[in-house]
């Protein structure tokens, strides 16, 4: 057990080194590859049930798997994949640099800030908006600013995912619409594991409300889509997602009784996905959950 706990952070810190400004060349998957760990559900005897089709709960510090359910089944991740977009943007740095909005940035649906071509905004403000309110036009602008085009940025996403071991994933754009992309609960946990270690992203994901000032002077109040943040200070962020194809998706993180955990839920058909997250994370905070190996 101790060997696993010590080794996992080193592996992921090594993975971090592949994600910065220039991602190593890799061979991203265009279809799901064979999953290494067993795909059978793992239900510890005293774990609460989850409605999500796929889920995984990990220790946010060691990467130990504490609970899993169909963790290697490919599913549509919806906007939870914005965590990878945010990670690439954050690692590039210079978040005070200005981004000029292009016409193509404004043609995304359905959640938008209402950005207009020619307007200029700091990367930091656009990044905050995608993590708090899931703004797709801000996401498209950041992707184009990062790599020149959405297609080039998508290539960077897939290379980055492959480099950190998320090899059952394929991303078709920066924001998660439409349903051409896929991932797994385990792969999204690998991405979330690194995002959790990014101080800038951690601060942004903890915000329940932010105010976005448009060039016109108009101010838009952005309320977090992650409803856990208002339930308890124990919960400290991550990302929501929803499409008809994906169902409800949620990546949540928290610190309960000294244990930091990350929970990924994909493919839930219930509006009680936040309640499910609370129950399982509280269960882990009581010291429940034994290691099922590293991610």
Model regions and ranges:
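C-terminal motif of bacterial Sec signal peptides marking the signal peptidase cleavage site
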Residues: 13-15
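Positively charged n-region of N-terminal signal peptides that target proteins for export
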Residues: 1-5
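Conserved catalytic neighborhood of penicillin-recognizing serine enzymes
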Residues: 109-140, 222-237
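Short, well-structured active-site flanking segments
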Residues: 91-104, 200-207
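Active-site helix/loop module of the DD-peptidase/beta-lactamase fold
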Residues: 102-117, 157-170
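Active-site SXXK
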Residues: 62-63, 76-100, 188
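Penicillin-recognizing serine hydrolase domain
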Residues: 19-32, 37-52, 123-124, 149-295
């Amino acid at each position: 057990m101790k060997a696993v706990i010590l080794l996992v952070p080193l592996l992921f810190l090594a993975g971090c080194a592949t994600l910065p400004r220039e991602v190593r060349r890799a061979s991203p998957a265009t279809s799901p590859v064979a999953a290494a760990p067993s795909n059978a559900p793992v239900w510890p005897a005293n774990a609460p049930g989850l409605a999500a089709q796929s889920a995984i709960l990990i220790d946010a510090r060691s990467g130990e798997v504490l609970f899993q359910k169909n963790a290697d089944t490919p599913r549509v991740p919806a906007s939870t994949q914005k965590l990878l977009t945010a990670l690439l943007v954050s690692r590039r740095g210079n978040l005070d640099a200005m981004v000029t909005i292009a016409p193509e940035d404004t043609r995304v649906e359905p959640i938008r800030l209402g950005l207009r071509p020619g307007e200029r905004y700091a990367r930091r403000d656009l990044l905050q908006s995608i993590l708090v309110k899931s703004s797709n036009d801000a996401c498209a602008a950041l992707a184009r600013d990062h790599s020149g085009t959405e297609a080039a940025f998508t290539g960077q996403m897939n290379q980055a995912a492959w480099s950190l071991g998320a090899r059952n994933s394929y991303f078709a754009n920066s924001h998660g619409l439409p349903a051409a992309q896929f991932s797994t609960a385990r792969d999204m946990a690998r991405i979330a594991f690194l995002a959790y270690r990014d101080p800038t992203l951690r601060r942004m994901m903890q915000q329940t409300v932010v105010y976005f000032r448009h060039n016109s002077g108009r101010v838009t109040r952005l309320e977090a889509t992650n409803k856990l943040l208002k339930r308890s200070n124990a919960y400290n962020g991550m990302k929501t997602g929803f499409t008809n194809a994906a169902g409800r998706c949620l990546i949540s993180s928290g610190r309960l009784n000294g244990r930091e955990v990350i929970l990924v839920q994909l493919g839930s058909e219930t509006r009680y996905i936040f309640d499910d997250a609370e129950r399982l994370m509280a269960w882990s905070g009581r010291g429940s959950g034994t290691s099922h190996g590293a991610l």
